[in-house]
Amino acid sequence: MKLIVKVFPEITIKSRPVRKRFIRQLGKNIRNVLKDLDPELAVDGVWDNLEVVTRVEDEKVQREMIERLTCTPGITHFLQVEEYPLGDFDDIVAKCKHHFGHLLAGKHFAVRCKRGGHHDFTSMDVDRYVGSQLRQQCGAAGIELKKPEVLVRIEIRDQRLYVIHNQHNGIGGYPLGALEQTLVLMSGGFDSTVAAYQMMRRGLMTHFCFFNLGGRAHELGVMEVAHYLWKKYGSSQRVLFISVPFEEVVGEILNKVDNSYMGVTLKRMMLRGAAHMADRLQIDALVTGEAISQVSSQTLPNLSIIDSATDKLVLRPLLASHKQDIIDQATEIGTADFAKHMPEYCGVISVNPTTHAKRHRMEHEEKQFDMAVLERALERAKFISIDHVIDELGKDIEIEEVAEALPGQIVIDIRHPDAQEDEPLVLEGIEVQAMPFYAINSKFKHLDPTRQYLLYCDKGVMSRLHAHHLLSEGHANVRVYRPT
């Protein structure tokens, strides 16, 4: 399979040295993303595109390659092509007939040729000749340029002919690793996950910072969605997941700060903490999922007071977004189900939160706060490589994995319903129950406690996360099913 990758248009208008650096980085990222599927993958580039060639013929693996590239920042779209030496017009007709002839009978079609290089003919000459011959030879109903039923697409580049089978859209943006890094404050909800995605899509390496307000289940949930975002959209680069224990900070706020200023104070403490982490990692910008006036702490006066807690640049990609638009994008990128079932901890709830915090009043309230509490929390922060968050879980609770299910055991398929439908898990003589990952924590308690359950997912990532959580909740009848 050969793919022609068209790079993000904004890359092509950069200076030659910058353009070469960005395209070289994109090529490196593509190799990183696909190397486990094809260690021999070839990636070569020219000024506005890259050619990706794999000798893997397994259609399932090819589909996985295509899926990963559609989620790789830096790619506008890519073409699935067959490549040939450029012959005369009749040879082009023969190649097009071979690939499209069976689709043209009784159909209205069009030919689109894109050409680059020095030739004694134009793209329009190719369109007319190939279209005329295909109409005569394939029994087509006619040529329709505006809304063709079948589109025959070819590219000619110097002395090479490319017959295009499919075009797959990418997410655009710059290649990860070509721009700067950011640190996103993650709660695991709709807003923070979409904000993180938008930074990654633009091409910024995005590390994750979670302030744990007192719930292990919440921490596991945020680990899970952060790992998902990285794996799907950013796995070409290694980033960190930082977890900061904020229980004492919350307690100090509840005891020392006036009720109306609790929410704003908590946000300021989080920004201070995130800025401290960013300094350690030499990161210049923080990212939050805040939108104007979505909640009381997000009015413009309050955001101004919150931002004054740090000199760091605070990016808010969702600032002017409507909530439904955010939810729609979360659904599109695959984080909505995580957000809907994310465990919540609401330890700081103001009865009458201020919507117009005053600077002098904020200074007064923070004077009551013992900053040593914040410093202790930051000292206990955990820095975990995002690809090792699953390994981290096994340090406090042993998670048993089995390669074979035994009669009497129940395998719970926790994959997304779409994956369950596409590739149903069928095990002879073994009961299999479908229970998506986002529902298992709430539904597991209703299962028969005398039975033994094996959690299954494709990679073993989500199954280990949820097995860890269930074991920590006291459910000893849980294992992970990892067939060989």
From Swiss-Prot:
Its EC number is 2.8.1.4. GO terms for cellular component: cytosol. The active site is at C457 (cysteine persulfide intermediate). InterPro entries: Rhodanese-like_dom (IPR001763), Rhodanese-like_dom_sf (IPR036873), Rossmann-like_a/b/a_fold (IPR014729), ThiI_AANH (IPR020536), ThiI_fer (IPR054173), ThiI_N (IPR049961), THII_Thiazole_biosynth_dom (IPR026340), THUMP_dom (IPR004114). Residues 405-483 form the Rhodanese domain. It is an enzyme of class 2 (transferase). One of its GO terms (biological process) is thiazole biosynthetic process. Disulfide bonds join C346-C457. Keywords: ATP-binding, Cytoplasm, Disulfide bond, Nucleotide-binding, Redox-active center, RNA-binding, Thiamine biosynthesis, Transferase, tRNA-binding. GO terms for molecular function: ATP binding; CCA tRNA nucleotidyltransferase activity; tRNA binding; tRNA-uracil-4 sulfurtransferase activity. Pathway: Cofactor biosynthesis; thiamine diphosphate biosynthesis. It comes from the Bacteria. The keyword Cell inner membrane does not apply. SMART domains: THUMP. It catalyses: [ThiI sulfur-carrier protein]-S-sulfanyl-L-cysteine + a uridine in tRNA + 2 reduced [2Fe-2S]-[ferredoxin] + ATP + H(+) = [ThiI sulfur-carrier protein]-L-cysteine + a 4-thiouridine in tRNA + 2 oxidized [2Fe-2S]-[ferredoxin] + AMP + diphosphate; [ThiS sulfur-carrier protein]-C-terminal Gly-Gly-AMP + S-sulfanyl-L-cysteinyl-[cysteine desulfurase] + AH2 = [ThiS sulfur-carrier protein]-C-terminal-Gly-aminoethanethioate + L-cysteinyl-[cysteine desulfurase] + A + AMP + 2 H(+). ATP binds at L185, M186, K267, G289, Q298. SUPFAM superfamilies: Adenine nucleotide alpha hydrolases-like, Rhodanese/Cell cycle control phosphatase, THUMP domain-like. Residues 63-167 form the THUMP domain. It is found in: Cytoplasm. Catalyzes the ATP-dependent transfer of a sulfur to tRNA to produce 4-thiouridine in position 8 of tRNAs, which functions as a near-UV photosensor. Also catalyzes the transfer of sulfur to the sulfur carrier protein ThiS, forming ThiS-thiocarboxylate. This is a step in the synthesis of thiazole, in the thiamine biosynthesis pathway. The sulfur is donated as persulfide by IscS. NCBIfam families: ThiI_C_thiazole (TIGR04271), tRNA uracil 4-sulfurtransferase ThiI (TIGR00342). Belongs to the ThiI family. This is tRNA sulfurtransferase. It comes from Pseudomonas putida (strain ATCC 47054 / DSM 6125 / CFBP 8728 / NCIMB 11950 / KT2440). The gene is thiI.
